[in-house]
Regions:
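Conserved beta-propeller blade signature
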Residues: 79-83, 120-123, 170-174, 223-227, ...
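Beta-rich catalytic cores
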Residues: 58, 68, 86, 101, ...
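Conserved beta-strand position repeated across blades of beta-propeller domains
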Residues: 63, 73, 106, 113-115, ...
Length: 387
């Protein structure tokens, strides 16, 4: 047998997760995930006059110099904590009333997010779970490492997590699908889980959830509502991102069914959508529906109370952009009769398909104003209302 050629080619590297499911006729497509801007934009350089809101509302840059800002958790004593994704940082912002200062709590983590409860900051990344006890008063406190108790899967794709404590005092943690479209290698993916704060008592609440990165609890029913990203490479207009109510034990379709009624052409299954939980609302194809907050404050007019607000970061897998805004989902408490309406727009220009901002997460302040993080510009806006 002859020797192998020294020039024999090594096997081709597998396609990145976001390219999975790309049809052959789109192999030369220039569509690709949008890289984040990892430097901060100063408040004076943010074109805030382009942002549009309903009459009576105003917006200001509440904090800048927080590159990659995503989820926001409110601590005690005027402290706020902000997670990021590629930068691997967690920021602490101190609100001094008229000014804000920021510092890095921890960095060099893999896609960290934040939650806060009973004086402790919880930080979860792809491979770590850390708890900072009493951090508001002791900024240099060493974290307690809870990683071993949470059984974190290692895959990075769709494994940035939004986390939050529910009305039951338990910590809710999603685990996204490790691909654009695939049969997951194990059942630990495409789930929403619930834990006790120390990592014990893990329960799987929902399966077939491709990638939820935002949820909140209805103020009246106490049911969790969550956003979910649809798959890519099925065209500009399919499938939709979706908004759902959590049914414990429910299956939400991935990988064989999307938006509750659309069988997948690649991962085929007989009667693929039978028994799948249906969405409350369709949030637009590839819109990147992110943070979710029910408004319960008294600052906004009464017609906004108990309305669901949703930040849509903006599409990449679409020739015509969609998203780059904050919308409202007005629906009955049981999820029926949902209507999606614009609230905060102006981050993009439909005429030339340009955009300058990517709203990502929302947080209601104690006074009823709403914070909106802009991952692209590394700033946090404050939206308020006055007659």
């Amino acid at each position: 047998m002859g020797a192998l050629s020294a020039h024999a080619q090594a096997p081709a590297a597998p396609a990145p997760a976001w390219k999975q499911g790309m049809p052959a006729n789109m192999a030369t497509s220039t569509l690709a995930p949008l890289p984040g801007k990892l430097t901060a934009t100063k408040a004076a350089d943010v074109p805030i006059n382009r942002i549009k809101l309903p009459p009576g509302f105003k917006v200001e840059v509440w904090a800048d110099s927080v590159p990659g800002s995503r989820a926001i958790a409110q601590g005690d004593g005027g402290k706020y904590y902000v997670g990021t994704r590629p930068l691997g940082r967690v920021y602490e912002i101190t609100d001094n009333g008229t000014t804000r200062t920021s510092r890095v709590v921890i960095d060099k983590l893999d896609q960290p997010t934040v939650a806060y409860r009973d004086g402790a900051l919880f930080v979860i990344s792809v491979d770590k779970v850390l708890r900072f006890d009493g951090i508001d008063k002791n900024p240099t406190v060493a974290p307690v490492d809870l990683t071993a108790k949470f059984n974190l899967p290692p895959e990075k794709h769709h494994n940035w997590k939004y986390i939050a404590f529910g009305p039951d005092g338990k910590l809710y943690v999603p685990f996204g699908a490790p691909c654009n479209i695939c049969e997951a290698p194990s059942e630990e993916y495409a789930q929403i889980r619930r834990y006790n704060a120390d990592g014990s008592g893990m329960e799987v609440l929902a399966r077939g959830v491709r990638n939820t990165v935002g949820f909140d609890w209805h103020p009246v029913t106490k049911e969790m509502w969550f956003s979910n990203h649809g798959r890519d490479w099925l065209g500009d207009d399919t499938p939709n991102d979706t908004m759902h109510r959590l049914k414990v034990g429910g299956h939400y379709g991935f990988p064989s069914c999307h938006q509750g009624n659309m069988p997948d052409p690649d991962v085929k299954k007989a009667k693929a959508c039978d028994g799948v939980e249906q969405p409350v609302a369709l949030m637009g194809p590839h819109s990147a529906t992110m943070g979710v907050t029910f408004y319960t404050g008294n600052m906004f007019p009464a017609e906004y109370r108990n309305v669901l607000f949703n930040a849509r970061k903006g599409s990449w897998n679409r020739t015509k952009k969609i998203g780059h805004d904050v919308v409202m989902v007005r629906a009955d408490a049981d999820g029926k009769n949902a209507k999606v309406e614009p609230f905060m727009t102006g981050f993009s220009n439909e005429a030339d398909q340009s955009w300058w901002g990517r709203p990502a997460y929302l947080h209601q302040m104690n006074d009823g104003a709403m914070l909106v993080s802009d991952e692209q510009n590394g700033v946090i806006y404050r939206v308020s209302y006055s007659k």
